[in-house]
Amino acid sequence: MPSAEFDTYFHDRAGRFSAFYRSEPVARLLGRGPLFDRLRGAVTVVEQTEARRVLDLGCGSGPLFAPLAALGVHVTGIDPAPAMVALARREAERHPGLVVVQARGWETVDERDAYDVAVALGVFDYVDEPAGLLRRMGVAARHVVGSFPAPGLRTQLRRVRYGARGVHVHGYRPGDIARLAAASGMTVEKITPLGRAGYLVHFVRAAA
């Protein structure tokens, strides 16, 4: 379960994190291009699976809403940070009838087959119990998409910076991701490298 420090950190910095998605050219100049690469990767999985219902877990300000709504997909976005939820609801108003935003954390996800795809971008970075999160997502949807930072210098620097504020940061190698899938009742369908930023992973629920 995320700590109170986690919720506070992202609540206090909601505007800053939202700003990362305002301009792709600027983001790429600042070395944040993978933020847009992983958005496109998630949308691609939604298209390939012909999904109609998507859970956007840790939706932040809602950068995934517009591209999914453009496909006619119904999106449920959840986030524990009140300021993020406020921004996400503002974005959801641009897509009436297609996007719903709920103020809750991943530990409350207990729906079964309520969605076709569950997405968590920029979430596994901070989760101390990733198998629990992936397992819940795999119950809620057959297909799961998640981003995972690589354990390089960038992650080490984030670990120091965020750790000073009580927020844990984790890094993953492909072997870690494979073990995580096995422990969560999932299989790895595809791993897409995101350069130094890590990986975007498409999981599928393992056959019973």
Short names for language-model regions:
Residues M1-Q48, A51-G58:
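Conserved class I S-adenosyl-L-methionine
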Residues S61-V99, R104-E107:
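Class I SAM-dependent methyltransferase SAM/SAH-binding core
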Residues V119:
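A conserved beta-strand element that flanks and buttresses the S-adenosyl-L-methionine
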Residues V127-M137:
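A short, conserved alpha-helix within the catalytic core of class I
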Residues A141-P149:
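Conserved beta-strand signature within the Rossmann-like core of class I S-adenosyl-L-methionine
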Residues A150-H168:
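Short, glycine-/aromatic-enriched active-site segment of Class I SAM-dependent methyltransferases
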Residues H168-S184:
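Short alpha-helix
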